[in-house]
Amino acid sequence: MKKIGMIRSGGQTGTDRAAMDTALKYNIGLCGWCPKGGWAEDYPEAPSLLARYPQLTETPSEGTSQRTLWNMRDADAILTIMPEGIASQGTVLGVREGTRLGKPMYTASGTGDIPGILEWLRSLPDGLDLCIGGPRESECEDAYRLTGEILEQVIQKLT
């Protein structure tokens, strides 16, 4: 059985999108909640994200908070990637909710955190539904690239 059974994400640009694209590249299951209509900052009109990522499910709300809260609720564990420690409002909400729910959590800021991520993941059960989140691209220009780099190395070292 794989360590990561499912990558869960809300589909926003930056960290979320890199997590989703990495899941697809490595044939890891993909799921997550997105705002009603599939809204993301680069896909403002329906069907938006849902045309590109049909694995996502719409929340009843068009706002982003419900998406964040529901993804935290439904995950087994939460990996937050905040390049250079940049924390957006949604990222802070996710960390607070994960803490409130008592979920296993790890926060990374760069590739130097890969050994810690690996150690943390190896301490958790196989088949994880892993929620991956962090800032959107408009809040951290390097979020997509850095998240993709981290996740590629982590997945390659887990297999």
Label each residue range with its predicted role.
Residues K2-W120, L124-D129, R136-L158:
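Acidic/glycine-enriched connector segments
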